[in-house]
Amino acid sequence: MLLKLFLTFMKIGIFTFGSGYAMLALARKEVVELNNWLTPQQFTDAVSLSEITPGPIMVNLATFVGTKLRGVPGAVVATLGLIIPPMAVLIIVTKLYIDLKDNSIVQKLFKGIRPAVIGLIATVIIKLGKTALVDYK
C-alpha cells in the first residue's frame, strides 16, 4: 500500500501542470474513482481542510490521504511521492529554460499551456461543486 501511495502521488505530481488546484482533477480521479480511497464527499471535505490549513493544498491533501490510509508512514510516503519527482523535473526544466528562454518556440509553448490549465481548474470546480452543494441534482 505504501508503494501504491507513493506511485499514485508521484503520478499526480509529475503529470499535472499549474498550481495545486490544477492537480486536483487528477488527484480526484486517482483517489476517488480509480483507487476508492475516499468517497466523493470525503474528497471534497479533504480539499476543504487542505485549503484552510497552512501550506500548499496538494501537499496537505497528500498528507491527509496518506494519514487516513496508513497513518504517519502513509503521510510521509504520499507527500514525498508528490514533491520529490516534480522537484527533480523542476531542476532540469529550470536549467533548460535558462538556456532556451529567448527561443520563440519555447515562448509559444508556454502560451499554449495556459488554456489547458484553465480547463483543468474548471473541471475541478464543476466536480467539487456537485458534491459541495447540498441536495444538488
Task: Please describe what each predicted stretch is.
Residues 1-50, 64-137:
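Multi-pass membrane proteins that catalyze or facilitate reactions on polyprenyl-/lipid-phosphate substrates
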Residues 60:
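Conserved beta-loop-alpha segment that forms the PLP phosphate-binding cup at the N-terminus of a helix
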